[in-house]
Regions:
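Conserved pre-ATP/AMP-binding loop-to-beta segment of ANL
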Residues: 8-27, 34, 57-63, 173
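Conserved AMP-binding/adenylation subdomain of ANL enzymes
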Residues: 46-63, 73-112, 125-127
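GHKL-family ATP-binding catalytic core of two-component histidine kinases
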Residues: 18, 39-41, 116, 149
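Short beta-strand->loop structural element characteristic of the AMP-binding/adenylate-forming
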Residues: 36-39, 66-67, 89-95, 165
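Conserved AMP-binding A3 loop
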Residues: 23-47
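Gly/Ser/Thr-rich phosphate-binding loop
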Residues: 110-115, 124-186
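Conserved S/T- and glycine-rich ATP-binding loop of Class I adenylate-forming
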Residues: 22, 28-31, 64, 70, ...
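Structural detector for helix-capping/boundary residues
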Residues: 2-3, 20, 42-43, 68, ...
């Protein structure tokens, strides 16, 4: 087998880390001025993923579609770390593609996604729709990073049959601080 682990030089030792050690530096969007660097610890990143997993009742059978950049807390903590914490999986796309979004949801058997309001608007004004199986499989979509207009949310849910959960978070908190509840049965 050509697994990466088997090919790793055994003389290379991993560094000991603790939950309070710095894990990464991520910048805010700069909504209150100049973007600020936020240092996250390993535990803060795990907490950000955990709060998402709990709020959305993520299970090992869930698979997220990540179309957001991983240098954004929504992409990293919500659609990568949260699925891993819950035992699920995540499909990471190089970038958002309006023409491929629903096809990717179908192809990879996606059960949920997290996007920003602009993407919801692009999908709503796009030509493509999910097929019936994909609609049934999608438990919810998640909108964050900016306010989502009620009429846009309602139009999206009516057209695609996918409930949208609006959440609010901060780079500083490693994910959401508020989340609307899941629809009943989700």
């Amino acid at each position: 087998s050509n697994s990466l682990i088997e090919e790793t030089d055994p003389s290379i030792k991993l560094h000991d880390i603790s939950p309070s050690d710095h894990a990464l530096l991520m910048y805010t969007s700069g909504t209150t001025g100049v973007p600020k660097g936020v240092i996250h610890t390993h535990s803060s990143l795990l907490a950000g993923g955990w709060t998402t997993a709990v709020a959305h009742n993520l299970q090992s059978s869930d698979r997220a579609l990540c179309v957001l950049p991983l240098y954004h807390i929504n992409g990293l903590c919500v659609t990568v770390i949260a699925p891993l914490i819950s035992g699920g999986s995540s499909v990471i796309c190089p970038k958002f593609s309006n023409s491929n979004f629903w096809t990717d949801c179908e192809k990879f058997k996606i059960t949920w996604f997290s996007v920003v309001p602009t993407i919801i608007s692009h999908l709503l004004h796009g030509k493509n729709d999910p097929n019936k199986i994909t609609k049934k499989r999608l438990r919810f979509g998640r909108s964050a990073s900016a306010p989502l207009a009620i009429d846009t949310q309602s139009s999206f849910e009516k057209r695609f049959g996918v409930p949208i959960i609006e959440t609010m978070g901060l780079t500083e908190t490693a994910a959401q601080i508020l989340s609307n509840p899941l629809p009943p049965g989700q």
